[in-house]
Amino acid sequence: MSVAANAELMDYDDVIARFDPVLGLEVHVELSTVTKMFCGCTTAFGAEPNTQVCPVCLGLPGSLPVLNQAAVESAIRIGLALNCEIVPWCRFARKNYFYPDMPKNYQISQYDEPIAINGYLEAPLDDGTTWRVDIERAHMEEDTGKLTHIGSETGRIHGATTSLIDYNRAGVPLIEIVTKPIVGAGERAPQIARAYVTALRDLLRALGVSDVRMDQGSMRCDANVSLKPIGTAEFGTRTETKNVNSLKSVEVAVRYEMQRQAAVLASGGRITQETRHFHEAGYTSPGRVKETAEDYRYFPEPDLEPVAPSRELVERLRLTIPELPWLSRKRIQQEWGVSDEVMRDLVNAGAVDLVIETVKHGAPSEQARAWWGNFLVQKANEANIGLDELNISPAQVAAVIALVDEGKLSNKLARQVVEGVLAGEGEPDQVMNARGLELVRDDSVTQAAVDEALAANPDVAEKIRGGKIAAAGAIVGAVMKATRGQADAARVRELVLAACGQG
């Protein structure tokens, strides 16, 4: 990513030589419940604006919230998976502020009494090691409405002529997961931030509590960054970069803020405690001066009883926690017999779960890995999308592999079939038939092509007859070209050698 042309940044190596970064990550996750946090409105994504609302989520006078028990259970499962203590008693609070995204002028959240506290998550790093990130708390709250600003170059409110509000998202259940300060990371701080959010995404996906689609806003990361001079104990003033919407952007935003803040401090300036916006070009810009807890005038929510999860409920939910993704991957790596480097490449490409699903449909793991880890990664990169966003399913990849194993396709022809599936031309066998790609398995047809190629290249044929077996490659190439790659190259070679008395 490029950065703003007028950005004043310190060289990254100089930053690390002079400062220690301190990170704090706040991740908001929309839960995959059927209804909202405090009312019966659906949480389905993508509906027409303001069609999934009611008096509760619109904050109309006299409406009262009713707590979604499924959201509470999801919060407990998340806390358990993050090695948190599930408290025996917690309650909601009103976070008071005036902004159009919440029409009742307060958000129901949890302030000083969250449902889960004091956990940790081991984040796998690129070099095969892990970094333990301590979790301060995970608390429940409701999401806000979505504002769309019209007329500004940046899509933000500054310079906009019109702002549109969609309250469909208002009241959707959220879990906010807040880390304790991450210190001692040094030059690896940006990588650790990305690794933590990646590990958290994978964990939540394995739990089935959220679709964790950062591109759709169901998982959002706020990155707090501050610097302190090497050797000092006191933390610096932090900034909070809001709503970073991709894993790579988390890393870029943290690195940028480290370089920007270092340049400000080195020039004698002071860091302003503020929120900042992340831009896809790779830089941040000022938002608003950061509020403190006192600004929000928190007080206990009077319309909701405290939440007191029983020990029996917690233990029952503990039994539903699946194998952690990184442990599952280690086991799978051993089953597949691949190196740490190969496994990291598959993980970084987002291919592991897709390979597993392909194997479930009958494909050998080696071939499934080859397709998802090579050709399909290239196609995803060309389209600038995630691997799981490609227009092909694990079942379809398994079907292509089966066609190769059955001798109906070569690997080269199989790639053409996959391209057809990606283009929406149908199932693999339909694409193969429609494009006429099935391998020629009739020896009489192949033999005729071999005879024609030998007749057209008498000098090469004579070399083969004289014992220069390597020369057969030229004839095989001519036959493959004549048959548009639909002949079996190994069988063509056999027929060429036999025709020249070398079989």
Curated annotation (Swiss-Prot):
Q: What is its EC number?
A: 6.3.5.-
In terms of SUPFAM superfamilies, this protein maps to:
GatB/YqeY motif (SSF89095), Glutamine synthetase/guanido kinase (SSF55931)
Task: Provide the alphabetized UniProt keywords.
Answer: ATP-binding, Ligase, Nucleotide-binding, Protein biosynthesis
GO MF annotations for this entry? Answer: asparaginyl-tRNA synthase (glutamine-hydrolyzing) activity; ATP binding; glutaminyl-tRNA synthase (glutamine-hydrolyzing) activity
Classification via InterPro entries:
Asn/Gln-tRNA_amidoTrfase_suB/E (IPR017959), Asn/Gln-tRNA_Trfase_suB/E_cat (IPR006075), Asn/Gln_amidotransferase (IPR018027), Asn/Gln_tRNA_amidoTrase-B-like (IPR003789), GatB (IPR004413), GatB_Yqey_C_2 (IPR023168), Gln-tRNA_amidoTrfase_suB_CS (IPR017958), Gln_synth/guanido_kin_cat_dom (IPR014746)
**Which Gene Ontology BP terms does the record give?**
glutaminyl-tRNAGln biosynthesis via transamidation; translation
PROSITE patterns per the UniProt record, alphabetical: GATB
Q: Which transformation does this protein catalyse, written as a reaction?
A: L-glutamyl-tRNA(Gln) + L-glutamine + ATP + H2O = L-glutaminyl-tRNA(Gln) + L-glutamate + ADP + phosphate + H(+); L-aspartyl-tRNA(Asn) + L-glutamine + ATP + H2O = L-asparaginyl-tRNA(Asn) + L-glutamate + ADP + phosphate + 2 H(+)
Provide the function of this protein: Allows the formation of correctly charged Asn-tRNA(Asn) or Gln-tRNA(Gln) through the transamidation of misacylated Asp-tRNA(Asn) or Glu-tRNA(Gln) in organisms which lack either or both of asparaginyl-tRNA or glutaminyl-tRNA synthetases. The reaction takes place in the presence of glutamine and ATP through an activated phospho-Asp-tRNA(Asn) or phospho-Glu-tRNA(Gln).
Q: How does it assemble?
A: Heterotrimer of A, B and C subunits.
So what family is this one in? Answer: Belongs to the GatB/GatE family. GatB subfamily.
> What's this protein's name?
Aspartyl/glutamyl-tRNA(Asn/Gln) amidotransferase subunit B
Organism from which the protein derives: Mycolicibacterium paratuberculosis (strain ATCC BAA-968 / K-10)
